[in-house]
Amino acid sequence: MRIRPDKPGPGQESVWDYPRPPRVEPVSGRVTIELNGQRIVDTTRALRVLETSHPPTVYVPRADIVDGALRDADGTSFCEFKGRAGYLDVVAGDRVAAKAAWYYPNPSRGYEQLVDHVAIYPGRMDECTLDGELVTAQEGDFYGGWITSRGVGPFKGAPGTWGW
């Protein structure tokens, strides 16, 4: 299957121009995350991971997540680039979003910036924003990319795209 990347307009970037292996860089702008009517993240210190065909995955500093909003969850997964990830439940009041976040306690060489940062699936939260823009979650139940008007695809994640 031949993929035809969408052409980016002014101020946009194509996920097909992102590198593989992925690159880590600072997010320019403010990141907010809300669950159960509570703002659990409000930061200007987030990082994003850029990988070919994926919308950016946003990692927020643990220190910028409201106390008590994270709790350990069972299970791990492995990324060929970043290493072994652990999972976290996200908690706000009486609501628990099971395994809605992940982190790399000992990331692989080249990804050390991700220590003490957590990625949260935007589709499992009530609202995520990037610089005031409402984020759309990447399709599928594995990847946690943040789609905004700044990025164009097509994006990996939907059924039939795993082989890209």
Q: Model-predicted segments: where are they?
A:
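Terminal leader/tail segments of proteins
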Residues: 1-164
